[in-house]
Amino acid sequence: MWKHYLKCDGSPDPSIAQEMNTFISLWEEETNETFEQVIEKSKLVLSLIKKLKLILLETPSCDLGDKMVAQHQGSILRLQELLSQKVDVATELLLREASTLADLDSGNMEKIIQDENVTLYVWANLKKNPRYRSVKFSGTQIGFEIPKILATSDVALRLLHTRYDHVTPLFPTAVPGEERAPIVEEEFRKEKSTEKAVSTEKALSTEKAVSTEKAVSTEKAVSTEKEATSQDEEAELKQDREGSLVPEKEIISEALEYNEVPRISYQEDENAEATKYELEMRLLSEAVSAAQLHLVKNIVELPDILENEVDLFHFSTLGGVYHLDILALPPQYKPVKGWVLVEIRQEGLQRFPYPPENTDEPDPESAFPPIEVTLEVDENVIFFEDPQVIRWDAEGKLWRTDGISCVVYDREERLITFNLDTLGPVTLIQDTHINMPYQSWELRPLGVNRVLITVTTLFTELQIHIKENLCMLASIKLRSQEHLSHLEGKWMRPVPFIMALKEAGVNIFPTVYSHFYVVVNNKVPMVEVKAYRQMALLSSAFAFRWSKWNMSCNSSRVVFRVKEGLAEEAEEHLWALLMFSGDRAQLLKIREDSEVFSEALKEETEFHSTLYHMVKDFASPEAMEKVRHSDCQFIDSVCHMLLSIRVLSFS
């Protein structure tokens, strides 16, 4: 979070729990904030939530730990709940002065407050005219068709369009502890035991040195005492000395060994440091492998889905959430002799129940018909097919498809109209896998540490430019005039870039559940991971492309085309067919336009253990020089993008 410290803007560091708790507590104490003030504060709140989500997504689970993951998710939930509470309080303050903001023509109050993240539409029914049943907000086609009972009641209609989704429950982003690679935990135990053994050996050496010092000093004292004795005891002393020669030699030998102790300990320290470094590197490698394998693994079983429940593994919510509410109109301000009086109710903003839970009407459906709603679809979201409308079930904490009827979508005007049995949060969904499987793909170098990934689907062709550790949407081709101007040309790190594309409706990133909804060319996870690693390593100088023969080989092998990227010619004969099994790479004798698949080795070529060693057989010195000068962050970014798109399994 070095960038955070450089800003010095007084905002809390989302990675520090104490700062987040202080920020939330101080904001809770602020009261009577207007809607404009809440919207302004929400910019910081949404930024903190986004940073917390990025921490959870970008940081390896072994570095965060379950406690830290729970802490960050708790901070996200608290911020979301507090922001919702602040919006309700600000809405109540606005509705209290509805009479002073009333329109001169209709006599009712209408208010629109807009921001890049939030748009508020509020209509207060002050006149209660039974013939005034069509509510359209000025300058828009957004509005409601309300029944007579609402047209004659003290109610207000609120449409709060948030371009973020704080309704859908957070899904865990960390890998559960039991799914981590066992070898990682084993190596941690080995490292601890090695450090313990080294420290024990040092302690024994120190203890041995101390005992040697004591023995030498004792011998010197004895010799001095013997020289001071009388001459008549000389023979006896001589005999005593002869009898003590062996222990003396042992003591001297121990003293000499003691002099060598520092040298031996220094060597042991060096060996221990080298062993520790090797262990750390191995642990890091295993942790990275576990994280990469997690990106390409497939869940064995789908969770149970209730009737009319939206399967969020199959569909994605897009365009934010439309919070539709019928509110009880609060007491209005009353000017009295220069004073303004208002009744303050402690229960706060109240929802108006529609239809009521208990009714004596013989035909409730005719007395309380559905409410017609017209909404505008977010212009920064692409729907490749007509969107579906779903509603939030607050009691069950899930999205549902029932209670919605007569859906009409106007693609040209980007308007969607539907009937809703009861108002509440609604959103639009699209099939998550609408652009899967891919029709083709290509990874092409643009220079050292620069590549272009092209993915062609049924509905679109998009190009992703990767430079060093940053990604950018270079172009996107669509059937209509829609385009993602807010994303094109904007450089982002891989994880935020993937999030931005998903939120825009352009999803080419499979999940662990995607194989249930897409016909995939499933490959062995480790083979797929190793292939992406090798492709990323060579991507500065070599181009890779989709091959139809990848469907013909078994799951333990992948087939794709390769050529040196320095060659400017576009002839098809420059592309070679390559087959890789994770531990063996070979060029195939067949070509892309051959009629029958064969694993026969190409003439005058050899088997190799990696793609790197294989391409060295035909690559130019300039190409291999580019590979050697590739930046590690660039290689990691390309590898992460390939692992996220999974071109070998979903093409």
What are these regions (language model features)?
Residues M1-F383, I404-Y409, R414-L415, N419-S651:
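Noncatalytic interaction/regulatory regions of large eukaryotic proteins
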Residues P387-Q388:
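Short beta-strand elements bearing conserved aromatic residues within extracellular beta-rich modules
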